[in-house]
Amino acid sequence: MCIRDSPNPEVPGTEPPAPIKLGFDSLPTSMTDGCVVPNGYVAHVFAPWGTPLNDNAQPWDQNGNNSSNDLLNAMGMHHDGMHFFPIEGSSTEGLLAVNHEYIDENALHPNGPTLVAGKRPAEEVRKEINAHGVAIVHVRRANGRWTIVNNSRYNRRFTSATAMKLAGPVGGTDWVKTPFSPNGTQVRGTNNNCGNGYTPWGTYITAEENWAACFVNTGTRPAHQRRVGVSAGPAGRYRWETATGDATEVLGEFARFNVTETGASATQDWRNEVNGFGYLVEIDPYDPTSIATKRTSMGRFAHEGCAYSKPEAGKPLAFYSGDDSRFEYVYRFVSEAVWDPKDADRTDRLAVGAKYLDRGTLYVARFNADGTGEWLALTGATQGTGGRTLADEFG
């Protein structure tokens, strides 16, 4: 502690700086069940669950009578992370990327989820699958209110059934080969999208979080499935796999949620389907023809979000993400490529993403008892507490 006999003298002819004030009146503590904003501000609901994005969807029905096709062409359920991408720098028109993290089954269906002779109806399952994922929505503000631009070419949905690319070190390996993608370069869907991020080149990052329990293994779960929390049965979280064998099923769309090893190889059952989930997914909101890409270099876990450090020309980029499960870790991905400011203005945004996000080093944070910490590189040569390297463990 430092004690002075008298305060610091003021500099002659100057006035002390004015205290910093909020630009709005603070709100008192309240038990009000509603959205309350300060005086001079207005809040209104727009783009809620079920809002059509185009004329292929019927208006939202509060009794749960909308179809799976309606949900494929409308806002998904339970909005979470989101980001606004301006169109030509505008603050009144742009593309809103919105995560749809999970579902409320009782609200989706007229009588809640049904189970008939141990099976879920295919239409109900498709509806739930389409209520998950991400929406890219063209929005515009006029007269103080935001609205969706219906039928905009930018409006699109990514669901738990949308085909996506697997990029980085996992893509194309034996770990992700399935009957749907025998070469391991694609996977269907993104699930339980919680937090989010964005990139310096204008793409959206959606984080897959609590995806593991949507899958079930009724046999012997390998260590990597136990580690992430794949269900041991008798069913997955939503019982989507029970619709297997429905006459309308296409390419194992329901069977894939049962990752029990039953075939002679990975392309004869769905053991690897779950390995296509647990990543940060990059989406180009400005290109409605682009394919969402899972950036496997950035780690596989229950991602909560993604944030990057200040880009500096000639230096690598760093992206930070946390595993939002109990007793888990904080991670940092450092790109192999160094930042070129010209890449911020390129229109081939997913190619830029491949440049920075497909090759690099993933680190995990270690926090010491004395308050210090360090970043531990997760490479093949990294040793664990038992002295074995990651290469020894995983080959």
Residues covered by each model-derived region:
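Conserved small/polar residues in nucleotide/adenosyl-binding loops
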Residues: 1-6
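Conserved small-residue
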Residues: 8-395
